[in-house]
Amino acid sequence: MEVNILAFIATALFILVPTAFLLIIYVKTVSKND
């Protein structure tokens, strides 16, 4: 089970990090348009 938990955490970080980065760029772009 420990391996599955670690894999879940690694996958979550792998997805959340780029997503958060894209969201920050998107928010900055929208703010500039306003």
Swiss-Prot record:
Keywords: Chloroplast, Membrane, Photosynthesis, Photosystem II, Plastid, Reaction center, Thylakoid, Transmembrane, Transmembrane helix. GO terms for cellular component: chloroplast thylakoid membrane; photosystem II. The keyword Ribosomal protein does not apply. It comes from the Eukaryota. One of the components of the core complex of photosystem II (PSII). PSII is a light-driven water:plastoquinone oxidoreductase that uses light energy to abstract electrons from H(2)O, generating O(2) and a proton gradient subsequently used for ATP formation. It consists of a core antenna complex that captures photons, and an electron transfer chain that converts photonic excitation into a charge separation. This subunit is found at the monomer-monomer interface. Belongs to the PsbM family. This is Photosystem II reaction center protein M. The gene is psbM.
